[in-house]
């Protein structure tokens, strides 16, 4: 169990991070190398894999990192479980844009794991999540947006939710989502499960 005062402290930290987010258009068409990072668990061990993929050739290389995870799963505080391991797994990888399995600003405090990692590393990130954490879904011009307090913070394509982490914008998320679930995240997911079994 996590003490209330710690969660209140972490909320303040998230609000601070959200104030340092840079929302700007990156241009998915400019990405030559894209990275994806994911994590799998066995007991209290986390198996994180970062993948760097060449957009044109599809060639990729990866790095993995295994570490102990002591923070429980609490919705809205995923970064405490996963960000330390994810950051270790992507160290040294060559890429222009990082896709994180989790939310960006489509988060109650606009500070999901993709935002935390993006701000800490001062790097372009997009969060790609399998479920909605907050906000309302509104269909506009054949696109489903996630609205939070009257602001568009994400988009939904298929069953996945895309939101800016840092140094990208909603249009980047739309362009990414239109292409289908990112191959680099599929590879990262496959590798985490493979490494977990070894």
From Swiss-Prot:
- Its chief place of residence is cytoplasm
Reported EC number(s) for this entry are 3.1.21.7
Q: What class of enzyme is it?
A: hydrolase
* Database matches in Pfam families: Endonuclease_5
An example of a Gene Ontology cellular component annotation for this protein is: cytoplasm
Where is the site Interaction with target DNA?
A: 73
Q: Name one GO biological process term.
A: DNA repair
UniProt: Mg(2+) binding residues: 38, 101
**Location in the cell:** Cytoplasm
Gene Ontology molecular function terms on file: deoxyribonuclease V activity; magnesium ion binding; RNA endonuclease activity, producing 5'-phosphomonoesters; single-stranded RNA binding
| Keywords from the UniProt entry | Cytoplasm, DNA damage, DNA repair, Endonuclease, Hydrolase, Magnesium, Metal-binding, Nuclease
What reaction does this enzyme carry out catalytically? Endonucleolytic cleavage at apurinic or apyrimidinic sites to products with a 5'-phosphate
- Which cofactors must be present for this protein to function? Mg(2+)
Give the family from UniProt.
Belongs to the endonuclease V family.
Q: What does this protein do?
A: DNA repair enzyme involved in the repair of deaminated bases. Selectively cleaves double-stranded DNA at the second phosphodiester bond 3' to a deoxyinosine leaving behind the intact lesion on the nicked DNA.
Task: State what protein this is by name.
Answer: Endonuclease V
What taxonomic lineage is listed for the species of origin? Archaea, Thermoproteota, Thermoprotei, Sulfolobales, Sulfolobaceae
Q: Which gene encodes it?
A: nfi
